[in-house]
Amino acid sequence: MRKAIAVASSLFLALSVQAQNVDMKVVNETIPTYQVGAPEIDPIFFTGRVYQGAEGYIYPYSLYDVMTDVVEDKDYQIVKLGNKYIEIGILPQIGGRIFQAEDLTNNYHFFYTQTGIKPALIGMLGAWLSGGVEWDIPDHHRASSYMLVDWTTEEHPDGSRTVWVGESELRHRLKWSVGITVYPNSSRVEASVKVINPTPMVQSMLYWANVSVHCDEQYQVVFPPDVKFGTDHSKVYFTDWPNGPVVRNNDKTVDLSWWKNFDQNSRSIFAWGSRMGFVGGYDYGKDAGTVHVANRFQVPGKKFFLWGNNPAGMLWNKILSDKDGHYLELMVGGYSDNQPDYSWLAPGEIREFKQTWFPVKGIQGIKNATEFAAVNLKNLEDGKWLLGYNASIEMRNARVILAAGDKILLDKRIDINPDKYFLETVIVPSDVKREDLYTALTDAEGNLMVDYRPVNYADKGLGKSGEELPKVIDGTKPVSEYKTVEELYLAGLRVDQFNNARLDYMDFYNEALKRDPDDARVNIEVGKHYIRQAEWSKAEEHLLRAKSRLEHDYTRAFNTEADYYLGYVYAMTGRKAEAEENLWAATYTPAFKHPAYYQLSVAAACEAKYSEALHLVDESLLTGAHDLQALTVKMYILRKLGRKDDAQKVFNEIKSIDPLDYWSEFEKSMLDKGSMSFLASTRPRRSEGMIAIQELLEVVCNYMAVGADEDALAVIDEAVKIGNPFSDSQLVRLYRAYLLKDEDAAKSEIGIASGLSSVGNHPLRIEEVGMFGRLAEICPENAVIRYLYGNLLYYIGQKDHGLEQWRKAADLDPSSALACRNVGFGEGQKGDYSKALEYYDEAIKNNPGDPLLFAESDKICEKAGVPAIQRQKRLEAGLKTVMKYDDAVIRLLKVYNETGNWNKAIKIMDSRHFHLWEGGGEIHDIYVMSHILKGKSLLDKKAYKRAMEEFRLATLYPENLEVPAPAKSVTIEDVISEMRQELNDNYAKFGDEDSASKAKSLDELEKLVKEIKMK
């Protein structure tokens, strides 16, 4: 049971002004919550994991994959926005999602609202919560969707209120903010989305709002009526819409818009080719629904996902919620119409767009919608048409018309608002064609609110739309099949852009360079690849090749990308004159004028040439007016020039663009107080733990980039003064050591860092390569520095150098389980299994309570061909630890089956609740194998009834394993048939002498099954 307690805060009392119709308050709600285990202590590096069709990176985050059955009441801060029509609740603690949304006029939850918190293994890092609205940037089910994000609130002169949520994500170092606004006298929920690339590198990003709604047999997805086709993930399959196969490549067609018809499996369908700007869903049982509206050019993605009306769907309902029922996701994509579908974000670029949702009711469906209203026009029978309008705003003396060509069939003046809808049945003459009908709602002044003209497709759907299905993607071919360098370049670019986990874009680029070593396009991409790895000399080599080709015969290049990135390489390696030459050359073309001038401004600021720096940053802002990094640099420069009033104006501009911008807050504190003392006051509304540390270090790096080391140190000192998480962070302490000018003081700080825990300290920036190199020079025998340096190098792609640093760390401190494990992991990836096991054994000796060590090392044992009985002894030696972690238990169960200890395996599987990743099913395969192996052993003993029971158990899908049953059930006969096939195969291959005897046993078993069924 929830209890809501308003937070006693004068701030929120001031915001809670009923007269302005929008109430904003923060409440504490106590919600039953399934606890998530502690995050994984070992860093998890990328080894090719595919997640949501793209690279499934964990590092630089930690893994949160231990779900529990422990339910505790937990307090959450929920920020509520409401007026007389709607109330929504935003939950900063779990990703900043919209957690609650209710239409107060009919108590309809227009977003799926959880009454409990029950995470499952669906998120990029593991723990994930269904329901509400999740902001997925720059990847689907983004890494931090179950973490606290930054948040703040705003009130506006028109009485509207906004809650801003956002973060600086760690994988690509992109920043995003979403402002969620409710307006007076309106049912609209508006999201102002900002996706920001503050880095000097081009990045790829994906945006989807993952919107969930309650559904049942009477729920229908509403794609725009001009949608003729749907497509699956990656556009590998198309179907007619709405009538198509419920299972891909199946002849049986159903109406795919109805949840009830998905009786086989889960499904995702993306709308294809719509020129309308809305998508929605309608519950005919409640006569209510949800609609989303946005600029279709900026927000083209329209998709639904459902677990479906089938046994697997029912199981997922239980996994994700104890009592809140079925849900369906009505997703919408910004700059993306599929998943994965990434687009490029230039250095310093900010993308800004708006989305609007509102509840609808009483109009029995939706045919079109704008942010102001939704319309339904539906053919009933005998010439009757149902016409309905639902408004998201209040309108008096509005006008509704229905026309057939020039003939007006209905013309009414009405009052309409979110609580008062319009619904009427109109007689339409029999000679009127549906496509000749037209209806519109205008306000009292004649401004169009929404209109609709029926779309007519002859024989639409049922595979008879009159048009062929759109072409599926060709897919990326093997490198050798591409005939031209251009094709190789474009294939590699797509692999890079889409963060493809299965392919390496460098394979395509390397082949292209074999054919044409000086191809400019390919050399630029390879240069950028090496920049990301901080391989500066290699980056320079390829960028110079590109520059040489582009500027042949003293040509002023049409594309100055090579100049820009060369300038950045030289700036990062201290070659100032060469950096300046190339950055100025990059300003010659519009595409790189903005980031090049920014880098030139930063370089001038480093030399305290503030007047010059100001001019240069202004030049950058001419083509990148909303670049928050450039604006904050300008604010910093103005402060250094003593122009405080002008700096304040820039701060106001920054906050008007992104109220959650962090660096400018530090500058504002320096402007007002001459110190970073504001930091403590912002903590309640900012991220926590390692995310808070990394966001702080982004600011520190920004100050270091402009040569403001004293300010960078002041930020760290203020953070350390606050205490945890900053004071106990090795990373924070090592940054401080690096910034201290006195080497003895630096050594002292390194000593403090070395006494702290390394868990969760995950360096991630290419700027840190130089820092750790310098720290290693100051204290070459420090194991912590070597360990963290290794993490950084391995993560950015310098794997051999990273492994070398880990080896040094393990040699310097053999008691470090983290370092020993990392060496074991690295050696295992290289294929040196004996050396890997040597280090894993050392790690287990140092930390016998870490179950990941057992899971990972058993995989190495398996690859190395270690006998199963030895693997069993190894795992059983740490049985108490192994049993803490599903992955380790699964390794043990597999070994038990190999060693004939299936009874032990069955006992564990009968009593343990496994929490599996979405799409995972290995535990059920093990379960089936255990019972079949046991059944076979009983069959050999001619214990037919007991064998039959084991085979029957093998056909089941116990709920505690969390593996959904297939739509078509498996029978004992199926099991026997498979065993007979296996027997025949073995006889054909090996001439098995026992075949006749075993076949006879199977005959006896089949006979017994038939006898029992007849009874």
Language-model segments: what does each one mean?
Residues 27-39, 43, 79-80, 86, ...:
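A contiguous, surface-exposed recognition patch within enzymatic or periplasmic domains that forms
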Residues 44-73, 78-80, 129-187, 312-343, ...:
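Extended, loop-rich substrate-binding clefts of extracytoplasmic carbohydrate-active enzymes
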Residues 366-483, 662-664, 670-681, 738-767:
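Long, contiguous interaction/recruitment modules in multidomain scaffold/adaptor proteins
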Residues 486-487, 521, 561, 595, ...:
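Start-of-helix register in tetratricopeptide repeats
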Residues 493-494, 528, 568, 602, ...:
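Residue-level recognition of tetratricopeptide repeat
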Residues 509, 543, 583, 617, ...:
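Hydrophobic/aromatic packing residues within the alpha-helices of TPR/SEL1-like helical repeat arrays
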